[in-house]
Amino acid sequence: MMSASPEFYKPAPVFSPCSSPLRLLQQQHGEDHQEEYGYGSSGGCCRTPTGGESNLKAPGTCPPAPRKPRAPAAPCRKRLFEVEVLSLRLEELERLFWRPPPPPPTTQPQPQPQQPPQKRRRVAKLGS
């Protein structure tokens, strides 16, 4: 890597009131403009404004700290109604959930589904 050569180093320019934009404004407009902006015969180039419009207002009261919003109400876990219990006999249940009986077994022998052929395994022979 290359390091910066000291011959190319330039320090930052120092602030000078002569190069201030206020000083340039003073030179352009003359003495009447100096008194208007307050940097005339008093010797300084800037001063704190003392007019009524620049004064701070009286401190008011601070607003309250922000609060976390309340969580929405959870659904009620308590039962608000009576549960009606029904008692049914087995015949009534079978009638409600009736399934057709399975088909009777056939006397013809069904063909066996074909088995997929066995996979061949390769065996490595040692010492041949």
Curated annotation (Swiss-Prot):
Probable cyclin-dependent protein kinase (CDK) inhibitor that functions as a repressor of mitosis in the endoreduplication cell cycle. Keywords: Cell cycle, Nucleus, Protein kinase inhibitor. GO terms for molecular function: protein kinase inhibitor activity. It is found in: Nucleus. One of its GO terms (cellular component) is nucleus. It comes from Oryza sativa subsp. japonica (Rice). Residues 99-116 have a biased composition (Pro residues). Residues 118-128 have a biased composition (Basic residues). This is Cyclin-dependent protein kinase inhibitor SMR1. Its main location: nucleus. It comes from the Eukaryota. Residues 23-76, 96-128 are annotated as: Disordered. The lineage of its organism: Eukaryota, Viridiplantae, Streptophyta, Embryophyta, Tracheophyta.
